[in-house]
């Protein structure tokens, strides 16, 4: 069953809107996995496909729009701030834990977090900082935003990106207005955030079929936020939280050469690294058979830590 819900963020005037999916069989209170998307995602973008596998294991899914995106509040629109998004995950944990609306429906003692791509990094921080989170699933995560941007753009492309950021910073200071740049595209034709031409067609197809609220652009100011983004300091803080990391073999979008060392820095022995061969970063969205492989790994993890111990 799907139900639209809302809850306030850490800024009480800004509401976060979400879809709550509960299993069709059995009865609550259900364990729940909180799901947020990556760069410029909305809650309808691919996450419900993953959630189907979790529902089959008796785990509810709370899929939310970050502030500044989709149906949630927040200005300017299409503004990506990793730390605000991490705070929105924690506000979702607050809602599950404290709101009467969820009592008897969701079990606040059995909360997991799932993230993909940019949010695959977010959940590592959430798991490290929030003792209420009982397990983490980090899929194809961004670990260090600066490194990813430099590696993806190369030195010449990175010069063009940072020149645009500097130009925009002056303009924004003088006018107060935010301009945008494309989420992805062909860097030979325009400056984009993520210079991977294969990304745009996948997201355009998803927008046309299931996620009409998706806009394939972000504020230029978002670039500065991602350059400051670094999850490595939080990895040693994952002392006892069960953590699954799913990596696409050879991933050159979120850089598997950073993901695997990051996994090794996670302290808990309750951890698992799954390197998915034969898949790319984007086929985990565009190819349902590749999506299923990752989703089953995640569902197994949720069952192991949120379901099986409570039978």
Question: Where are the predicted features?
Answer:
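Alpha/beta-hydrolase-fold enzymes
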Residues: 124-204
């Amino acid at each position: 069953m799907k139900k639209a819900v809302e809850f306030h963020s850490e800024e009480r005037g800004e509401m976060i809107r979400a879809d709550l999916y509960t299993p069709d069989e059995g009865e609550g209170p259900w364990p729940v996995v909180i799901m947020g998307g990556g760069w410029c995602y909305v809650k309808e973008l691919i996450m419900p496909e993953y959630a189907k596998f979790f529902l089959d294991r008796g785990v509810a899914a709370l899929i939310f729009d970050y502030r500044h995106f989709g149906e949630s509040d927040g200005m300017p629109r299409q503004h990506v701030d990793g730390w605000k998004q991490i705070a929105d995950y924690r506000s979702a944990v607050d809602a599950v834990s404290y709101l009467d609306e969820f009592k008897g429906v969701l079990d606040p003692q059995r909360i997991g977090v799932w993230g993909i791509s940019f949010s695959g990094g977010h959940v590592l921080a959430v798991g490290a900082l929030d003792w209420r989170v009982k397990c983490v699933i980090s899929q194809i995560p961004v670990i260090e935003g600066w490194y990813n941007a430099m590696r993806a753009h190369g030195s010449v492309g990175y010069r063009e990106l940072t020149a645009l950021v500097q130009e925009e910073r002056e303009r924004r200071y003088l006018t107060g207005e935010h301009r945008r740049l494309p989420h992805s595209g062909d860097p030979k034709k325009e400056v984009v955030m993520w210079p991977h031409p294969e990304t745009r067609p996948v997201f355009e197809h998803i927008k046309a079929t299931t996620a009409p609220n998706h806009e394939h652009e972000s504020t230029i100011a978002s670039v500065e936020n991602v350059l400051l983004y670094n999850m490595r300091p939080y990895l040693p803080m994952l002392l006892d939280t069960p953590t699954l990391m799913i990596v696409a073999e050879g991933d050159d979008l979120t850089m598997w050469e950073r993901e695997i060392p990051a996994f090794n820095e996670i302290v808990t022995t309750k951890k698992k690294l799954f390197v998915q061969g034969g898949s790319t970063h984007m086929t985990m969205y565009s190819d349902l058979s590749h999506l299923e492989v990752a989703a089953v790994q995640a569902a197994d993890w949720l069952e192991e830590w949120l379901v099986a111990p409570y039978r």
